[in-house]
Amino acid sequence: MPSPMKAGGTAIAVVALGLALAGCGSDTKSAPSSSASSSNSSKSSSAKSSSAAPSTPAQAGKNETIADYIKESGITETPVKRGEPGTPTLDLPIPAGWEDAGAKTPDYAWGAIVSTDPTMAADPPSIVALMSKLTGDVDPAKILEYAPGELKNLPGFEGGDGNTSTLGGFDAYQIGGSYVKDGAKRMIAQKTVVIPSKGDVFVLQLNADGLEDQMGPLMDATSQIDEKTTITP
């Protein structure tokens, strides 16, 4: 998620990354971050859609999130692991030049991939997938409404409001931008997908994260994921 942003600054990079995660605008129509992911998206950079126009830095902690909605609505959230019985089947492609994160996958994640480029080995770009099962009076529209809040609350976040989209035929919301971690600016894009299944609602979140000069590999990878991912509820 390198060079494109040099042509027009971070603003262009943010938009480009978001569009890549959105499938370059294809399959876009009128997702989430769970309460677990809202505390973990900025932690996933080492293992580890979009904005229409850049905005000024967001004020940390000022935007309502999916985690807030879950808590306020008395909804029960259960983290989902890959292959767990009774959960949606997610087939995420692994692009060339990337590999499964394996033991480096965060404990809270459904799965993760990282770049294998040796020039980025010190801090490789990553894409982390999280999934949660929501039980209770869940309004899918509210999940999408509050999806942008998590990224907007990251330290020094700069980006747009994001936009609606789809992934694997399911409604989603994507947002992208930059934020500051350990004094360095990083690029991040997030796609939140709502998957109704067997009377429950599952929420899938994809977090693509990397340094500013890793924009290119991230764009290529997220584009393939958007085009080739299949979801079976």
Residue ranges, per PLM feature:
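N-terminal low-complexity, Pro/Thr/Ser-rich intrinsically disordered segments
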Residues: 44-84
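Signature of long, low-cysteine stretches enriched in small and polar/charged residues
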Residues: 142-193
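N-terminal export and membrane-targeting signals
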Residues: 1-14
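Bacterial lipoprotein signal-peptidase II cleavage site
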Residues: 6-9, 20-57
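Extracytoplasmic/secreted envelope proteins and their assembly/folding machinery
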Residues: 95, 141-148, 219-226
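Secretory pathway targeting signatures of secreted, lumenal, and periplasmic proteins
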Residues: 81-137
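Short, well-structured beta-strand
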Residues: 171-233
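Soluble non-cytosolic domains of exported or imported proteins
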Residues: 89, 137-141, 212-220
